[in-house]
């Protein structure tokens, strides 16, 4: 029976891990952070384990069928064995392809909620109007996926919107909405156009994964702790013992010191609290900088030439330029039917990943 033995071994390891995770989860009662981590791992490994069970069943059935064909004389049993073998040979390549996709590395942000920011770019009034149009599309798409939308900010202008931001929460939101990031181009005849000329305008869409709260983990080996005598007014040492504490976080150079406590232990505890707060603040600033840089990279300048997708109203046509996909159903897409486009983009991404990994 022919099958991908290397793939089989890799998937079998994941199935074993899935079983181990389930057993581990049963023993944890109060460590909610650990429970959350295990559940995230189980979410993916369970799908793979279930597919592996189906894969193994088809392989085993094929092996048994081959053995029967080589030994069985009863014509009826031979016919049944041949049917089982044909079914296994047809099913195994399909399941193997599904398993390969499941093994592909995933974006660590795929399970996160998203923050979406929409702005008019080139094209004047039509650009502002289309911000509102595409927002309605996203609202309909949110509802169709049983996600939840929360408006963060809406800034209307004379004809449409100069800015809209909102959050979408739900299952695997970023894994699908991330493909909406970029410049969207619209071609249509404005209501104010008396000569029927088609105008071209653009808007920018940034889709950002919701940021997790930054946890500060301090490695004791990264700390340098100095003690010294506490000073009073005028720099005079107010006691003979070195009760003041200065803690330096060596990797970042962040320093926290305390001398107000009555003992070295008290000052050390206070200095550690201060250090954690300072490191948290520094991490937040870095995270915000990365967040801003991600937004800049996604939306570009808003120039028409940077488009990811074109919406042509006169021809009822939508073209996604990243994969050269054209659909003549703009009216349906603007009502929130984005799945055909997004599914095609996901397939393209998976195909490229498999090609790069040589699988």
From Swiss-Prot:
The keyword Cytoplasm applies. One of its GO terms (cellular component) is cytoplasm. SMART domains: PCRF. It comes from the Bacteria. Methylated by PrmC. Methylation increases the termination efficiency of RF1. It is found in: Cytoplasm. PROSITE patterns: RF_PROK_I. Keywords: Cytoplasm, Methylation, Protein biosynthesis. This is Peptide chain release factor 1. It comes from Ureaplasma urealyticum serovar 10 (strain ATCC 33699 / Western). The lineage of its organism: Bacteria, Bacillati, Mycoplasmatota, Mycoplasmoidales, Mycoplasmoidaceae.
